[in-house]
Amino acid sequence: MRRLFLFFALLISGVAQAGTNPFETKPDFLPVGKAFVFTSERLESGETQLYWQIADGYYLYQKRLKFDGLPAEQHPALPEGETHSDEFFGEQQVYRQGLELKIAAGATGQIKVGFQGCADAGLCYPPHTQVVDLGGYLRYRCDRRSTGPSPGQRLQQRALGWSLLVFFGLGLLLAFTPCSLPMLPILAGLIVGSGATPKRGFALATSYVVSMALVYAAMGVLAAMLGANLQALLQNPWLLGSFAAVFVLLALPMFGFFELQLPVAVRDRLENVSRNQRGGSLFGAGVLGALSGLLVGPCMTAPLAGALLYIAQSGNALHGGLILFAMGIGIGVPLLLLVTVGNRFLPKPGAWMNLLKGVFGFLFLATALLMLRPVLDESLWIGLCGGLLLIAAYSAWKQSEGFGRVAHVFGASSLLLGVWGSLLMIGAAGGSDDLMKPLQVYSASNSSSAANPVSHDAFTTIKDPAALQRELDEAQAQGQWVLLDYYADWCVSCKVMEKQVFGKAHVMEALSDVRLLRLDVTADNAASRELLGRYKVPGPPSLLWIGADGIERRSQRITGEVDAGTFLQRWTTTRDAH
């Protein structure tokens, strides 16, 4: 079994390094300057405040924020956003309603702030840049009539609430690991001493738990401060791979390959200090709690390291401190129960504690896979997920042998995990890119569309305005209709339409007599801006019909994402009207 875990862990590490209809509602997309109203302001503290007022129905991508001209160590810490999922780019962090950032005092000169966003209705704007003078000159203003917390602050508060609950639960689980639960009675005796009343015992245990949680909170604050500028680097595939490899390394101790703990010299020194502390007093209990936060056992080291790594990526010191404080409180809850009501409410030690360690191990491997998703081919990523589920299924089946009456639970879990893992592996072999519908790639409807290669070959890709003009002149000379498809690699809706509209055989058959030009505006350069500006297109996806006379049928223009039926209906209307 260990060999199987080790093989999969090495495999991940190796890979790491290596339905709305806009025509019915006629959405009126805002210009980029109104969808994302940007302001910068020099504060009395010397900091420079950047603020985006984001219109309803629009969102900014976290990973598209750029600060050209500003040293990496001075980049503002990016708050947690809202998770936005799509079929092609996976989970992305986005900001809605408002975003507020601060550049630390001391930064000088002019910088270029880049950002990019999309509309929920299916339009993606090209990258946009604003020049900000860090010397205090306010170039861009907007009316921020706000009397309470900004929308961005409210979003952060909601995300923080969930994080507190998750980390409290994580701490509660860590309290039941083999290194922690059997030690609780001994620990209670050290803290409380003999003859203490339940009320006194609760006060002493609370002093211990709060002190321990404060040490964890300090670790969280330090990790966030050290990683405050990490977000700008996390778009690097090598760095993502390195972090994924670290999580794989943290998973191995959970499966018993080795023990990860503090160096012996440090551990012995802390233990000596701990033994010299006397229980029975609030101060002594508090000191013991603080030392226990530093004296991390082998079952705690890997989960704590993983939590600190997660916090370092967020770069938010307050957030990091609070969630690790919540984790510390969760770890201390069983101790509080023990000193007040006895051990009748606590589970008895047993083989289930080793099972809990294994669960943490699988969570670490899953985290490694999630970190790798942006840099892996989607079908390869789905295949790796399937492999992890199959190993989890085998593990659950093996564990069922030692749990008697609840063995059927492990058997059912093994069956479910095995079936899902097998489906993912089969789907990945066929090129599936859908985690929840892995076999859809083999369906008849998808096969018919996938078998039609004309969706890519029929389009002529244009990146230069002069090349566009030549194609238009030639089409007009031949009396041919032209379809201009504004496209970009970063446009999610473009990917959807490429697959669900132009990937359909009957759609391409209807366009057989039309000259198909794909205007690629992926790059943020003068050529892309000129292509967008020629017909005043806000961004991709946008579809324009140019008649045989060389004139655009403006009333039939398509802006945003549509399905195949709507597209064909619009083309039929355009063609029959002229």
UniProtKB/Swiss-Prot annotation:
Name of the featured protein: Thiol:disulfide interchange protein DsbD
Protein family according to the UniProt entry: Belongs to the thioredoxin family. DsbD subfamily.
UniProt cross-references to Gene3D superfamilies, sorted A to Z: Glutaredoxin (3.40.30.10), Thiol:disulfide interchange protein DsbD, N-terminal domain (2.60.40.1250)
Catalyzed reaction equations: [protein]-dithiol + NAD(+) = [protein]-disulfide + NADH + H(+); [protein]-dithiol + NADP(+) = [protein]-disulfide + NADPH + H(+)
Keywords assigned by UniProt, alphabetized: Cell inner membrane, Cell membrane, Cytochrome c-type biogenesis, Disulfide bond, Electron transport, Membrane, NAD, Oxidoreductase, Redox-active center, Signal, Transmembrane, Transmembrane helix, Transport
Topological region Periplasmic: 19-158, 229-237, 303-321, 373, 430-578
GO molecular function, one term: protein-disulfide reductase [NAD(P)H] activity
GO cellular component term of the entry, any: plasma membrane
UniProt record, GO biological process: cell redox homeostasis; cytochrome complex assembly
NCBIfam families assigned to the protein according to its UniProt record, in alphabetical order: PRK00293.1 (NF001419)
Topology with respect to the bilayer: Multi-pass membrane protein
Enzyme Commission number, as recorded: 1.8.1.8
Keyword Calcium: no
Keyword Iron appears in the UniProt entry: no
Residues of the signal peptide: 1-18
Function: Required to facilitate the formation of correct disulfide bonds in some periplasmic proteins and for the assembly of the periplasmic c-type cytochromes. Acts by transferring electrons from cytoplasmic thioredoxin to the periplasm. This transfer involves a cascade of disulfide bond formation and reduction steps.
Segments forming domain Thioredoxin: 433-576
Annotated localization: Cell inner membrane
Residues on Cytoplasmic side: 180-207, 259-281, 343-351, 395-408
Pfam families for this protein: DsbD_N, DsbD_TM, Thioredoxin_7
